[in-house]
A protein has these predicted regions:
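Active-site/catalytic core of tyrosine-dependent DNA strand-transfer enzymes
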Residues: 115-119, 126-191
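Short coil/turn motifs that cap or connect alpha-helices
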Residues: 66, 74-76, 81, 214, ...
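C-terminal catalytic core of tyrosine-transesterase DNA break-rejoin enzymes
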Residues: 11, 58, 62, 69, ...
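C-terminal secondary-structure termini that scaffold catalytic or DNA-interacting sites
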Residues: 82, 91-127, 137-139, 168-169, ...
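Long, amphipathic, Lys/Arg-enriched alpha-helical "connector/arm" segment
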Residues: 22, 26-53, 62-65, 138
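Proline-centered turn/helix-capping motifs that create local helix->coil transitions or kinks
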Residues: 9-19, 93-99, 145-157, 261-262
Length: 262
């Protein structure tokens, strides 16, 4: 409020010179990223079993995906034959008219009084965000079981039958719903409050804490656009044995994938 007041006073000749012009702006203090360690992620994974957001939580922990990337995964992106999961699109909620033609498809509308478009974008945050994961046995079995379960569910709508993250009646689980239910999940289980996006940081930090993985490997796994992003945020490696990235992540948890999904 002080700055605008002095500008108004100078403009209307109440003062000769705005003293705020010579005041240096304080430098922004970089906020440390809050994330979970392996023990906390283990507790979260157990708490998420059977919850509304079980699948989004698992995909965030194991793959370090963003909310929009998780919601955007379709079964066409899951290549069971070659054990590959392709991340190439995302889902957002908003006004589709501001997006370039041919870069998206409106797949539904929210049910709020101010209805918004549910948009499947054919592009991600950056070009490097488009990536493919080799699916290990644990995630392969989980996704196989999930697909089989969805094939026999009684759906309220078929609009989202190709999407991986749907609820018990086949409705797409939207990014904001993930955030809402994630906060409730933490409250109900007495877990420290973090943002859902912090699960991405948690996943990448687990890899960075393992000297078996180079920063380049971690950059590719995370889908960072440049090496410096990975290095500046996650350059705190210390120990562990050599494994593939996904094998290492899943090995950190006791029962991320329980027997029901194997």
């Amino acid at each position: 409020l002080i700055g605008p007041a002095f500008r108004y006073a100078e403009k209307n000749d109440f003062i000769l010179k705005n003293p705020m012009r010579v005041v240096d702006k304080p430098s922004k203090v970089k906020k440390e990223s809050s994330y979970y360690n392996a023990e906390q992620l283990n507790k979260l994974a157990k708490a998420a079993k059977g919850s509304y957001i079980e699948t989004p939580v698992i995909l965030a922990i194991v793959l370090g995906l963003r909310r929009s990337e998780i919601v955007g995964i379709t079964w066409n992106n899951v290549d069971f034959a070659n054990r590959l999961l392709h991340i190439k699109q995302s889902v957002i909620v908003g006004d589709s008219s501001i997006l370039p033609q041919g870069t998206y498809r409106v797949i539904g509308h929210t049910k709020s009084h101010k209805s918004k478009d549910i948009i499947l974008k054919y592009f991600l945050k950056t070009d490097s965000s488009e990536r493919s994961f080799t699916i290990n046995d644990a995630l392969y079995n989980y996704l196989k079981a999930l697909k089989a379960e969805q094939e026999v569910m009684i759906r309220e709508t078929n609009a989202y039958k190709d999407f991986v993250c749907v609820n018990a009646v086949g409705t797409l689980i939207l990014p904001d719903s993930i955030t809402h239910y994630f906060t409730n999940l933490l409250d109900e289980n007495g877990l420290p409050h973090i943002k859902f996006h912090a699960l991405r940081h948690s996943c990448i930090s687990l890899l960075a804490n393992n000297t078996a993985f180079t920063m380049k490997q971690i950059q590719d796994y995370a889908g960072h656009s440049d090496f410096l992003t990975t290095f500046n945020v996650y350059s705190h490696a210390d120990n562990s044995a050599k494994k593939t990235e996904m094998d290492y992540i899943t090995s950190c948890f006791d029962d991320l994938f329980d027997d029901d999904n194997n």
